[in-house]
UniProtKB/Swiss-Prot annotation:
Subcellular location: Secreted
Tissue: Expressed by the venom gland.
Record GO cellular component, one term: extracellular region
Disulfide bridge positions per record: 2-16, 9-30, 15-41, 32-39, 45-49
Protein name in UniProt: U3-plectoxin-Pt1a
Record bears the keyword Ubl conjugation: no
Domain notes: The presence of a 'disulfide through disulfide knot' structurally defines this protein as a knottin.
Role according to the record: Potent toxin that may paralyze and/or kill insect pests such as H.virescens (lepidoptera), S.exigua (beet armyworm) and M.sexta (tobacco hornworm).
Biological source species: Plectreurys tristis (Spider)
Length: 49
């Protein structure tokens, strides 16, 4: 299964594909923070993957 919002990830494929955020469809991706914070999925999944 795919991972939810702010869950650690290694690649975009681990995060949900899309979500509706404030009425707009957003592509979800694995974002990496600076200073060794690690990578996490960009938006909350809800139940859709």
């Amino acid at each position: 299964g795919c991972k939810g919002f702010l869950v650690k990830c290694d690649s975009n494929s681990e995060c949900c594909k899309t979500a509706i955020v404030k009425g707009k469809k957003k592509q979800l991706s694995c974002l990496c923070g600076a200073w060794g914070a690690g990578c996490s999925c960009s938006f909350r999944c809800g139940n859709r993957c």
